[in-house]
Amino acid sequence: MVVAPSQVEQQNWTPAASAQLYGLDQWGDPYFSVNARGHVLVQPRGDRGGSLDLVELVEGLQSRDLQLPLLIRFEDILEDRLERLHGAFERAIAQYGYGGHYQGVFPVKCNQQRHVVEQLVESGRRWHFGLEAGSKAELLIALSLLDDPKALLICNGYKDQRYIETAILARQLGRQPVVVIEQADEVPRIIEASRNLGAAPLIGVRAKLSTRSTGRWGSSVGEKAKFGLSIPDLLATVEALRDADLLGDLRLLHFHVGSQICDIAVLKDALQEAGQLYVQLASLGAPMGFLDVGGGLGVDYDGSRSATAASTNYSLQNYANDVVATIRECCEPQGIVVPTLVSESGRAIASHFSVLVFNVLGQSGVNQPSIPEAVEGEALIVRNLRETLSGIGPDNLQEAWNDALKFKDDALAAFRLGYLSLTERGKAEQLYWACCSAIADLLPGEEELPDELKGLKAAFASTYYANLSVFRSAPDTWAIDQLFPVMPIHRLEEQPRELGSFADLTCDSDGKLARFIASGSAKPLLELHELKDGEPYWIGLFLGGAYQEVMGNLHNLFGSTNAVSIRLSPGGPYRVEHVVRGQTNSDVLEAMEHNPEALLERLRQASEEAIGSGDLSISAARRLMQHLEGSLRQTTYLEE
């Protein structure tokens, strides 16, 4: 067992100490905190009142036969995110005397689940909040759900003729589609479709900005960006639309500088460049009217408020202020009417609203190395290791590590030359690992360690076996090393005395959670509690509401988890609005083109053969088939 160093001297542990330890006061504000019972508390409406004890909520859901792992969606948080986003822009518009307004859209790709998109459309109706589609399937979702004629339907992504025609025909349904030209070859397709259908959509253009971005999504901008028109392509598009008598339909300029803008300076540079492009397009005769600043409004996953990959060095209000002020400064001196401002802030809207709760199935760790008894006539190398072990203290950790490593290597060399017996070599290795364990227990925080000592803690840390699939529920942790806040949702009044990481259910060494938030960085181990016999240990993964549900896969055939939508209720603590049962074994088999009925039939035939050979009785065969049929109906995850 490795004791968390920052806690060794802590005597009177409190829930507030846990909140500080896990950074809850930073990344969780204003939706998550800790109550006096040591449970995570959810405030779905932020500082506007109302709260739920997350542990009591999970217990209530389990009593409804909804077992872990469980994805809990808080509808009030989703609505609150919309209110905060629009409120920030409304304050900025008032502060800077901006002559236009803000009208956002939600990128459907962030979370295509029907209940999520439906709620966003309904909650955003008062602001004419719209949707963004990046494929034909997403366009069909948006067309069916977005029934507000004043809401924007931004059509991005690669487009064939059917995609473009579908968008144009949507105007006949009272929708307001904007087909954004992202590739030069889309221009003739739009012209042809408009002629064939006798109607044109509102047209937008996406510009490749020269502004350099940072972080893992930095490739979204620049000359090598996947989408967007270069300046020559932009000018050619204007002339092609003019020749086709469609320039009057060019209404929107779009740019995008990454899914998570960590540094506000990147946004400022992009806004200045895009603002001037907007002015020039208007000067060339396009009526314009909308400026879509794309996605990128970031989420402070680690609470450090820094320009690192898991954080942002700006607030929501800071973001809105810079967008409004910069575009006003670009347009007004040139006599250009300021545009309606559009953003595709999917990550900032959806990340906070869902919490994945999973249970721990077991725990394993490296046993404390035993120390062999000293005997007369021990080899010098063994005596040296024994002396090193007895002299380890907080002030000589590096020296002790160097000595232990040297003596271990000496023991191996002596054994190879025949100067050390197998028994003595075994003693040397036991003493070496005892030295490592003693050093690991006294090490300070990871950020203070020299490189050669950083692996010691992990070598003695515990592995907690989690009832989930990382590939299904948090794929970005594996794919791009994304950091999400992970912490126990109860026992927070207790001092966590172990350091550990999580292994998931898949038969894959990458199936793990082994990077955890630290202030402005990441750490390989998380402070956790020792498991208690007969008591559950529940862990929450937070801020995963964007992308994780829709990007998860069926690795090892672990399917979707149970999911519920929760809303605060005036007549009680909460109301379960929607329940979506997780995939069963039968569901995932069918997804892989296996026929469950055919599978059962083959097993039935095998049981008949066993009956015929006398290996199985009829009653045993019946019980076997009932068990197999029941297994097909069960969840893919382990039952408690």
Swiss-Prot record:
It comes from the Bacteria. Pathway: Amine and polyamine biosynthesis; agmatine biosynthesis; agmatine from L-arginine: step 1/1. Pfam families: Arg_decarb_HB, Arg_decarbox_C, Orn_Arg_deC_N. The keyword Lyase applies. GO terms for biological process: arginine catabolic process; spermidine biosynthetic process. InterPro entries: Ala_racemase/Decarboxylase_C, Arg_decarb_HB, Arg_decarbox_C, Arg_decrbxlase, De-COase2_CS, De-COase2_N, De-COase2_pyr-phos_BS, Orn/DAP/Arg_de-COase. One of its GO terms (molecular function) is metal ion binding. This is Biosynthetic arginine decarboxylase. It comes from Synechococcus sp. (strain RCC307). Substrate binds at residues 291-301. Its cofactor is Mg(2+); pyridoxal 5'-phosphate. PANTHER family: ARGININE DECARBOXYLASE (PTHR43295), BIOSYNTHETIC ARGININE DECARBOXYLASE (PTHR43295:SF9). Catalyzes the biosynthesis of agmatine from arginine. Gene3D superfamilies: 1.10.287.3440, 1.20.58.930, Alanine racemase, Lyase, Ornithine Decarboxylase, Chain A, domain 1. The gene is speA. Keywords: Decarboxylase, Lyase, Magnesium, Metal-binding, Polyamine biosynthesis, Pyridoxal phosphate, Spermidine biosynthesis. SUPFAM superfamilies: Alanine racemase C-terminal domain-like (SSF50621), PLP-binding barrel (SSF51419). It catalyses: L-arginine + H(+) = agmatine + CO2.
